[in-house]
Amino acid sequence: MSDGIAPRVVAARVLALVVDQGRSLKTELAAALPTLEDVRDRALVEAICFAVLRRRPVYEAALTRWLARPLGRGDAQLRGLLMVGFAQLDVLKVPPYAALSATVDACRVLGWPHRVSFVNAVLRRAQRERLPVVSSDAAWPRWLAERIRADWGEQAEAIFDASLKPAPMWLRVNLRYGDRHTYVQRLQAAGLEAVPSGLVPEALALDCSVPVVQLPGFQGGEVSVQDLSAQQVAALLSPAPHARLLDACAAPGGKAAHLLERAPTLCLTALDVDMQRLRRVAETCDRIHVKARLCVADATDLAAWWDGEPFDAVLLDAPCSATGVVRRQPDVLLHRRAEDLLPLLNIQSRLLDACWRTLRPGGVLVYVTCSVLRAENQTQLEAFLARTADACAEDPGDAYGQPAGLGRQRLPGEQGGDGFFYARLIKDISM
């Protein structure tokens, strides 16, 4: 297969699985990318897939406008290939000759020599004409867009707009190995530029996304990839150096790792219901040379995992709609259904109640989600406080976003971070 063709073929296949079969983008990329030897080809596949999913309504509108007959249900890969071509011209700014040539050749490799002239004609039209204009919420399911508008009013447009933009690559420098300024110099020596955050002393925003193998010291645990909003959780919890700490929904392990980098003497229990995902926590701990007690269990089933000794602090990063991280997971909008929300709310409620039972009087529970839905955030928090007499909320402060009831909400893109909700709860020592 000639240069440039393979990544277009892979991207078309991945997009067909994600868009037409409801597969996870992360899962399909994890399976497909290792088939490409060149890291540049892998990066191109990722860039194409993300661009297509962010701009999918525009490309679908173009196909509707330009095709005399709509593509059939059996044409998923062909539809994906056309969108691969659109993304190269529209977002990635690949030179038109290279984009058309490689995409047309990919059509042959995919087994459609009789469709080559068709693909070429559609892409040449995309080169000549302006793509249709669609609303910023066009990719969002109607029920979800309406809920965002009801929750956020005039700020809803900012949420939709931010979710269409690529997210920066945030790094977390492990200060056990050196200071942030020194690491910036190492990045510069590797040809990379980064901007420090004023909110988190370990945080750096890269000027472009790169494979982790290009990050100095990554394999040795000197740096990790973690969004700014997620990095802020450690400071909000601020456990004492030898505290007993529970991370109740720990996978993939970034927040637990950050807490242990800051305080390696923590007695941290990392809990997750999924064995495969918990293995990622173990791999992360091994890479950064810290230790945690790992436990596969449902956090709500206390009899299955808790020995009855209270924790000093609990982190509950609850399962949620992921509406705050659409810019990183654009396929969320393809998969999310209205009927998904109530089960999520029930799980969050049960997790809050169970985790609270494990917390000692005077202890701290931090509840976070990567959602922008009030039902999962401030409404969930208010309901918990109403039924829990010994719980009180502390304001996390302005660094964590705008007030949202008794918590704080960062909207997507604010301070460069993902959409995140934060609440800090204290267990009353007098009750």
From Swiss-Prot:
Keyword S-adenosyl-L-methionine: yes
Sorted UniProt keywords: Cytoplasm, Methyltransferase, Ribosome biogenesis, RNA-binding, rRNA processing, S-adenosyl-L-methionine, Transferase
Superkingdom, taxonomy of origin: Bacteria
Major location (coarse): cytoplasm
Annotated GO MF terms: RNA binding; rRNA (cytosine-C5-)-methyltransferase activity
Positions of the catalytic residues: 370
Location in or out of the cell: Cytoplasm
Record-listed S-adenosyl-L-methionine binding positions: 249-255, 272, 298, 317
Enzyme class: transferase
SUPFAM superfamilies: NusB-like (SSF48013), S-adenosyl-L-methionine-dependent methyltransferases (SSF53335)
Catalytic activity as recorded in UniProt: cytidine(967) in 16S rRNA + S-adenosyl-L-methionine = 5-methylcytidine(967) in 16S rRNA + S-adenosyl-L-homocysteine + H(+)
GO biological process, one term: rRNA base methylation
EC number from the UniProt entry: 2.1.1.176
InterPro entries cross-referenced by the UniProt entry: MeTrfase_RsmB-F_NOP2_cat (IPR049560), MeTrfase_RsmB-F_NOP2_dom (IPR001678), NusB-like_sf (IPR035926), NusB_RsmB_TIM44 (IPR006027), RCMT (IPR023267), rRNA_ssu_MeTfrase_B (IPR004573), RsmB-like_ferredoxin (IPR054728), RsmB/NOL1/NOP2-like_CS (IPR018314)
GO CC entries: cytosol
Gene3D superfamilies: NusB-like, Sun protein, domain 3, Vaccinia Virus protein VP39
Pfam family, one: Methyltr_RsmB-F
PANTHER family the UniProt entry points to: NOL1_NOP2_SUN FAMILY PROTEIN _ ANTITERMINATION NUSB DOMAIN-CONTAINING PROTEIN, NOP2 YEAST -RELATED NOL1/NOP2/FMU SUN DOMAIN-CONTAINING
Known role: Specifically methylates the cytosine at position 967 (m5C967) of 16S rRNA.
Family: Belongs to the class I-like SAM-binding methyltransferase superfamily. RsmB/NOP family.
Name under which the protein is recorded: Ribosomal RNA small subunit methyltransferase B
Phylogenetic classification of the source organism: Bacteria, Pseudomonadati, Pseudomonadota, Gammaproteobacteria, Lysobacterales
